[in-house]
Amino acid sequence: MADGVIARLMSGGRGARSFYEELRGRDNVSDVDDRAGLLDEENLNQHFNDYDLENAEGLRLEDSRATVDGRIPRGRAQLSGRPPRPAATTHWGTSHDDDGDNDVPASLLVERYDRGAAPLGSPGKPRSQHAGSRAHPAPGLSKGRTHQQRPHIDQELQPPLHSDAAPSSLLAGAITGNAKKMAEWRWANITNLDSFMQDVYSYYRGSGMWCIVVERVLHLIKVAFVAFLLTFLSQCVDFKKIPSNQKLSQVLVPQCTRNMSGLWNIGLWLFAFYFMWKSIQYILDLRRLTHVRDFYIHLLNIPDEDMQTITWQEVVARIMVLRDQNVRTTRTITPQNQRWVLGSQSKERLDASDIANRLMRRENYMIAMINKDILDLTIPLPILRNRQLLSQTLEWTLMFSILDFVFDPKGQVHQEFLRSDRRGILSAKLRSRFIFAGVMILILSPFVAGYLIIVYFLEYYNEIQKNPSILSARSYTPLAEWKFREFNELPHLFKRRLDMSHPFASHYIDQFPKAKTSMVAKTVSFIAGSIATVLALISVFDPEMFLGFEITHDRTVLFYTAVFGAIWSVARGSVSEDNAVFDPEYALGNVVEYTHYQPEHWKDRWHSADVKAEFEELYKLKLVIFIEEILSILTTPFVLFFSLPKSADQIIDFFREFTIHVDGLGYVCYFAEFDFKKGSKSQAPAATAGEGDVRDDYYSTKHGKMEASMYGFINNYARNPKHLPPAMRQQFHLPPVFPGITSPTLAGDLAASRMGRSQRGRSKGPLPSRTPRPGAVMAEPSPMASILLDPRHQPIFPNNMSFVNTGHQFRGGNQGDGHMMGGGSMEEDVKGAARHGQQTHDDESEDSRAGLDESAWQVSPTKDLSRENSGRGLDSVVGEEAGNGAGVVHMLYQFNQAHLNRRLGGVR
């Protein structure tokens, strides 16, 4: 909507189609993936046309009929570029309605190994269905369905084509089917996993449905109270009458609402519009909250009472268990819809890394742009030309101008940004968005500044009056938070990491000697404290004089006692403690351990004044941050008008160069995949050493951001307990006698056992083996393996990459130069390994590009469904694999299921 308004304003109101409409239209018509060869049409087993979706019943493998008068839409035939052909018969001509046999045959399902399971449906019996039932029908909407009691949930591989398949209301769902069946049906028919995972995570951060509802109601009450209080004090009270009157009724302005100014009336109308809009939005959102609550209660077995205490890692684990219980269904769908599902909406990509990538898809790009200094945030004013300022106001405008422009409503990157020939027009449109955002900030700046000042004053005045020392409290600036934030780090995990660093950061700032400041502060505190003490003693002997005696005009003893008491508190807080020990290495070392931020020039200089000054720019007084936030409302338009348009070309190039496509996940930031090997391989064939260094700098992050992000991510989801002190954590776990189900070595063996004969014949390198060969770069089992990560995301380090050499050590270890980020980085180690072992690297890269069938522990995922094997049952396929020596895989699969159920308390 906003994009359309901008386009019409820029085009002068012409009736031509806007740029954003054309952008969305090109995304729907053409896909760059088709031209880039990201999808192998040859492996789809059958070629479908676009018009086959409307006549999908004729494509059933068990039945094929011709129709007498079958037609296809004219527009669709023209788009396909082929002459129209007779379509299959439609279900309108059928004389019977067999809803009981409306399910996918068991031969087309790849599900858990269960020999006792009854077959679902009859594959040899013809089926017919109504026009509006192509998507999964809601539970209870069809009569005589006996397959609703099955324990599994079918995964929808195409978006619902008709809305009448969904339940009409919650009441209808409650009458015709229980809440669990409704939750299962909604889970099976999710069409946007990014939006769904955002809802799940927002529900978790809000601590449940009722906490979210209470928070929203209190927000409306707070906003209404502020509007009423300001209107009453500014328009309905005559302050000139207060000295001569003793009652409130005597100073009120009669009919004050009729005498208000026009500007205040506009403000009240804007408030009324906001209040009504948010109220309607909250009421309509109750349905979505109810659906998410049912998902937590019935599918994840997490009641609302546990939402305030359960960890996010436990939620992810239960989502993975739900994913593993979900069978995969193949349907006769067009290649376009199949590309849509396999491209970004596969539920097999739902481990901890994939969920974080979906939640942080937009923020990862912002983290990378801040890290690589893509954005020019300098203030174009003579006195502040070399100063960068990132306020919340500027952050909101960046989200609107850049991210809302790059991403489509489905959360994917627009295809136009991946084409180099569209660089010029996209850069021009981005500059126009910057200018439009600057104009809107200029218009809204008086209202925003006034609102922030009033709310801040009402919220913190009493706290400052009771404890003036909080004026010296510090916090990280918004720019520092974006510099510290890591790829795939969720907001609540990032906040916890920063909160743990605050005591050490304050200790680092306070311990530096402040001789001159301490001497002045001691003198000021002595004088102010003496005057306050004298006034307090006088008030003890004569309380009436304390209240009525005026030291200056209209200023009593009480007033000056409060003033000098506040001065004494502030001055006393500026004095260094007498028993303070100067040890900046210890304090800043702990800060670096939690923030994971240490520029190269900070090493061996933690005690210097330059490092302290740089750190103070990142860790400022809260009062200074608030003043900068108010002033940024005035400086943000200048940044949007003059500084950021210079970065438009670099921003467009950044999204084109650092956007990759992951099957089942969609387009993500390159750094968020933690693919060190891929980056080193692409950078290896440089012409000269100088060119190689330039490319390495361009395709890598600064300050070891990607390496620190990977270690931080593994630390959040690994089995290493985080509630213990760092010195007591186990640095290495000895491998068990029988390899655990999360062991990377076992994952490699399972991948080898699941590899088909044709894949083994095309393999470039030797098959994985537990016995290392001399001179080969073998993957070592990582001590940080996690059950919340699929095998493709488990941390595996080659022999020539040392985990200790990266310098990541805990506080209990060595605290020398390599306290946190000493030694060579992982990116450099992997680049060196790629240059010395290209063949081995190619083999590992070939293994890492596994299909979506390897994203979950399956019994027989190597047997692709086709016309040749679709007629056979699942037992025959399993029998073939058992005959080929896959019985151990079944045993390990059962061991995995038992391990998961025991770990998650029997969640199924």
Swiss-Prot record:
It catalyses: a 1,2-diacyl-sn-glycero-3-phosphocholine(in) = a 1,2-diacyl-sn-glycero-3-phosphocholine(out); a 1,2-diacyl-sn-glycero-3-phospho-L-serine(in) = a 1,2-diacyl-sn-glycero-3-phospho-L-serine(out); a 1,2-diacyl-sn-glycero-3-phosphoethanolamine(in) = a 1,2-diacyl-sn-glycero-3-phosphoethanolamine(out); a 1,2-diacyl-sn-glycero-3-phospho-(1D-myo-inositol-3-phosphate)(in) = a 1,2-diacyl-sn-glycero-3-phospho-(1D-myo-inositol-3-phosphate)(out). Residues 238-259, 547-555 are lumenal. Residues 64-162, 751-779, 809-878 are annotated as: Disordered. The keyword tRNA processing does not apply. Phosphorylated by apg-1. Apg-1 phosphorylation is required for preautophagosome elongation. Residues 813-825 have a biased composition (Gly residues). The chain crosses the membrane at residues 217-237, 260-280, 526-546, 556-576. Keywords: Autophagy, Cytoplasmic vesicle, Endoplasmic reticulum, Glycoprotein, Golgi apparatus, Lipid transport, Membrane, Phosphoprotein, Transmembrane, Transmembrane helix, Transport. Phospholipid scramblase involved in autophagy and cytoplasm to vacuole transport (Cvt) vesicle formation. Cycles between the preautophagosomal structure/phagophore assembly site (PAS) and the cytoplasmic vesicle pool and supplies membrane for the growing autophagosome. Lipid scramblase activity plays a key role in preautophagosomal structure/phagophore assembly by distributing the phospholipids that arrive through atg-2 from the cytoplasmic to the luminal leaflet of the bilayer, thereby driving autophagosomal membrane expansion. Required for mitophagy. It is found in: Preautophagosomal structure membrane; Cytoplasmic vesicle membrane; Golgi apparatus membrane; Endoplasmic reticulum membrane. Glycans are attached at residue 259. Residues 839-852 have a biased composition (Basic and acidic residues). Homotrimer; forms a homotrimer with a central pore that forms a path between the two membrane leaflets. The gene is apg-7. Forms a homotrimer with a solvated central pore, which is connected laterally to the cytosol through the cavity within each protomer. Acts as a lipid scramblase that uses its central pore to function: the central pore opens laterally to accommodate lipid headgroups, thereby enabling lipid flipping and redistribution of lipids added to the outer leaflet of apg-7/atg9-containing vesicles, thereby enabling growth into autophagosomes. It comes from the Eukaryota. This is Autophagy-related protein 9. InterPro entries: Autophagy-rel_prot_9. GO terms for cellular component: autophagosome; cytoplasmic vesicle membrane; endoplasmic reticulum membrane; Golgi membrane; phagophore assembly site; phagophore assembly site membrane. Belongs to the ATG9 family. GO terms for biological process: lipid transport; mitophagy; piecemeal microautophagy of the nucleus; protein localization to phagophore assembly site; reticulophagy. It comes from Neurospora crassa (strain ATCC 24698 / 74-OR23-1A / CBS 708.71 / DSM 1257 / FGSC 987). Pfam families: ATG9. It is a multi-pass membrane protein. The lineage of its organism: Eukaryota, Fungi, Dikarya, Ascomycota, Pezizomycotina.
